[in-house]
């Protein structure tokens, strides 16, 4: 019911910060997504979001949503299955039996939060393995060298477009490709993946804009 007032202020673009389901206390402000198809219960439902975007459009207001690409919450169904030993689920992330490969990465990859979350990997006691966690230990990096990851994340992106989101802001997109011996930032493969996403969106939802965080 506040949209007419927002419109009267001259607003024609609303940027929604992360609002998808994420675990309380381990949500990084919503950037640790546990379910890409559900809204945080305290904010409402996906149907509420559809109603909101529809009303925004009636008011001439475009809607932008942060879409977290680099990682999922450790509570995501893929991560839970990986923790339980599912090899297919583990292939969606970066799992290692020991610290040998992670330590090679650490030689060239800078820390995002050196004080609050030092390092880029976390030991998972439940499965006695190391997983890549560039941001926080509860945010597991996705492996975009696995085609399933790209396909499913594009599916999640298109799902949000079908909910009425006009602009998809690709959060942490420079981090999505990992390669030993590099800083794992803004590598050429990142640009290739984003171009592929752009091609797909131009075919399926040409009115949707992709906005990359750089």
Annotate the PLM regions.
Residues 166:
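Receiver (REC) domain switch/active-site residues of two-component response regulators
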Residues 1-151, 162, 173-214:
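Acidic/aromatic-lined carbohydrate-recognition and catalytic surfaces
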